[in-house]
């Protein structure tokens, strides 16, 4: 249901209006062009959708080389807006303000509070959450398969301090900002819909970067049977 005369649309890429004249269009996680399930939608929007005044692709630095091949006349400069592909394009890379450190392996029983543990199947997520419940008193759960209402309730359970731990899939890396000091991977492999594969470095960085935000330093590491990150 879209309200009459809505001034803003906050929506998924698939549901965003493409038949309206909008002054501003912003698309987050533009590197999802490479995703095997949703990449065709991101690519179509990258190529064809523009705001009348401003178009912004967040995460676009990872797409710089690809966008550079779309037109011979593209120039990359520092302080102009991101506009049409045949005009000047600016890539702004904002450095992280806090320090993110790799701390190696740690047993779940020794992991400190304000920690997220990452797994890549519902079975793993629930098993780890149950282990934390027995050892430490409880954990919130975040998975992409949860309904928005349930996921938000779990996020609030953690953010309110009712529980000190979070167990999540890689859904935590997309648009969820929480008060985390640590992120630990219980696995570095995921099933991507076609095959079981290792996480690439950008995926590891996206998830690990949930630890510490703004001026607060963060740590990431591995736990359980997970092999060392190399």
For the regions a protein language model found, what residue spans apply to each?
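Conserved strand-helix element at the start of the C-terminal RecA-like helicase core
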Residues: 55-58, 111-135, 139-143
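Conserved helicase motor
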Residues: 1-3, 11-16, 121-123, 141-153, ...
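Conserved segment of the helicase C-terminal RecA-like domain
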Residues: 53-54, 59-65, 178-230
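Conserved RecA-like ASCE ATPase "motif II neighborhood" in helicase/translocase motors
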Residues: 6-29, 35
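Post-DEXD/H (motif II) to motif III coupling segment of the RecA-like Helicase ATP-binding lobe
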Residues: 24, 31-100
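SF2 helicase motor core recognition
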Residues: 12-21, 46, 125-126, 166-185, ...
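Short glycine-rich substrate-engagement loop in P-loop NTPases that contacts/grips substrate
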Residues: 2-14, 97-104
């Amino acid at each position: 249901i879209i309200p009459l005369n809505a001034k803003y649309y906050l929506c998924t890429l698939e549901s965003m209006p493409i038949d309206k004249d909008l002054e501003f269009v912003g698309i987050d996680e533009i590197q999802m062009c490479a995703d095997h399930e949703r990449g065709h939608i991101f690519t179509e929007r990258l190529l064809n959708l523009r705001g009348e005044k401003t178009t912004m692709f967040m995460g676009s630095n990872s797409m710089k080389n690809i966008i550079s091949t779309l037109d011979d006349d593209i120039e990359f400069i520092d302080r102009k807006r991101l506009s049409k592909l045949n005009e000047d394009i600016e890539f702004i890379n904002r450095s992280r303000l806090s320090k993110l450190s790799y701390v190696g392996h740690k047993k779940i029983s020794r992991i400190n509070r304000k920690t997220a543990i990452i797994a890549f199947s519902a079975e793993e997520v629930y098993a780890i959450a149950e282990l934390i419940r027995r050892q430490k008193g409880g954990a919130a759960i975040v998975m992409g398969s949860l309904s928005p209402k349930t996921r938000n309730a779990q996020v609030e359970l953690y953010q309110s301090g009712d529980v000190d731990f979070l167990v999540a899939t890689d859904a935590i890396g997309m648009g969820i900002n929480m008060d985390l000091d640590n992120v630990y991977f219980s696995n570095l492999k995921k099933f991507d819909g076609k095959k079981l594969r290792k996480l690439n470095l950008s995926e590891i960085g996206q998830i690990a970067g949930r630890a510490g935000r703004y001026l607060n330093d963060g740590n990431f590491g591995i736990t359980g049977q997970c092999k060392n990150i190399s």
